[in-house]
């Protein structure tokens, strides 16, 4: 991978006009977003369906949109999936298609919706890629308008608001069940069929999520089954990597697996426990090919003074209402001084620690296997290329590095 630092000249102007921090301003300038684009990206229409108090309002809005055949933009923050019909599973699978700068789903002619998540409900559910049209229900088994809409509206929303919630899926956009979690055989078949459809479409990326059970159903049989699958996955480490490499191989030209997140059973929280978890948090699956190919990738240069936990959190919120979603443009930071002796993390990645006065600690995990820990020493000044995130467990700012240059 060849990294190219972009030239930015309007950062201060965008900061003042858009009222944003410098990291967001540089991202906005690089992407060429207008103020209208930025507002659409920063203020998506979404409801947290885990909050039952606003669930009825959200349900009514969606029903009204379907009844009037008007367009409605929705970001679904969390939902359970295992009760959905087989056709709804296919529906969720096909919705992994990723457009140039956003997810785009619509029932009419191709429009430029701008950045953000767009789920458009109308009289026919389909996704378009240029001149190609792919129905959300392969085979046309559900052509009736009301039935097709009910796949999302009735099955999904009724499940969200129901009393039988057992599994939750954290959705950055919309994903599908991992094949390793308990699924009926028929759903497994359709899942494979859906992945094949995505391969034919040659979309740029796949988003993939798995399930985690709610705490209060500790004795539920399906949860016990999930725990067994979860433990086997973590202990062997093979299922996660096999699925990641399988998805990554679907389109060798451009496609990269963006993330694969397993829930932590019994906690009600979402944890990245797979061996590739931190690469996934970085915004893309960093494979060996990622380091060795000769593609050129833009990099946004940041100053050390740009960094703060608040700035990074706001930046991640802009990328998606859930902190993930839009592909992250790598950033570069020059002049960081290694604060402590380098160490290896649990997954044998090199970990560098930095400390910035009035800001706090910054962890850096190096995902490029070409680096050796003996190259780095406490007190060295370095330049880093990678992506920004916030560690869910330590709350520290984190740089997921793919290139580290020693400056002295």
Regions found by a protein language model. Give the residues of each.
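Mid-to-C-terminal polyanion-binding domains and interfaces
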Residues: 64, 70-71, 185, 189, ...
């Amino acid at each position: 991978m060849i990294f190219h630092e972009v030239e930015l000249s309007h950062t201060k102007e965008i900061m003042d006009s858009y009222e944003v921090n410098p990291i967001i301003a540089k991202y906005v300038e690089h992407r060429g977003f207008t103020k209208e684009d930025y507002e659409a990206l920063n203020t998506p229409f979404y409801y947290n369906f885990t909050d039952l108090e606003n669930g009825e309002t959200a349900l009514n809005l969606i029903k009204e949109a379907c009844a009037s055949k008007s367009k409605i933009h929705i970001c679904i923050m969390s939902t359970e999936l295992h009760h959905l019909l087989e056709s709804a599973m296919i529906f969720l699978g096909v919705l992994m298609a990723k457009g140039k700068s956003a997810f785009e789903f619509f029932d009419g002619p191709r429009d430029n919706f701008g950045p953000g998540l767009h789920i458009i409900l109308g009289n026919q559910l389909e996704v378009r890629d240029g001149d190609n049209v792919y129905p959300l229900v392969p085979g046309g088994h559900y052509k009736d308008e009301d039935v097709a809409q009910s796949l999302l509206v009735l099955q999904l929303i009724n499940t969200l608001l129901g009393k039988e919630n057992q599994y939750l899926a954290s959705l950055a956009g919309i994903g599908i069940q991992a094949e390793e979690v308990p699924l009926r055989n028929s759903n497994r078949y359709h899942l494979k069929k859906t992945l094949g459809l995505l391969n034919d479409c040659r979309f740029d990326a796949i988003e993939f999520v798995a399930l985690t059970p709610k705490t209060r159903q500790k004795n539920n049989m399906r949860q016990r089954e999930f725990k067994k699958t979860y433990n086997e996955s973590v202990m062997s480490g093979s299922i996660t990597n096999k699925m990641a490499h399988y998805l990554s191989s679907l389109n060798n030209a451009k496609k990269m697996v963006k993330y694969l997140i397993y829930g932590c059973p019994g906690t009600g929280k979402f944890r990245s426990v797979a061996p590739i978890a931190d690469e996934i948090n970085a915004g893309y699956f960093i494979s060996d090919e990622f380091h060795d190919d000769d593609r050129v990738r833009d990099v946004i240069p940041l100053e050390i003074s740009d960094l703060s936990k608040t700035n990074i959190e706001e930046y991640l919120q802009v990328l998606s209402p859930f902190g993930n979603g839009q592909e992250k443009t790598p950033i570069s930071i020059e002049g960081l001084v290694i604060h402590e002796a380098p160490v290896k993390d649990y997954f044998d990645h090199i970990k560098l620690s930095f400390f910035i006065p009035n800001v706090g600690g910054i962890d850096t995990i190096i995902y490029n296997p070409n680096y050796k820990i003996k190259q780095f020493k406490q007190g060295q000044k370095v330049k880093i290329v990678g992506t920004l995130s916030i560690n869910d467990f330590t709350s520290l700012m984190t740089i997921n590095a793919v290139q580290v240059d020693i400056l002295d």
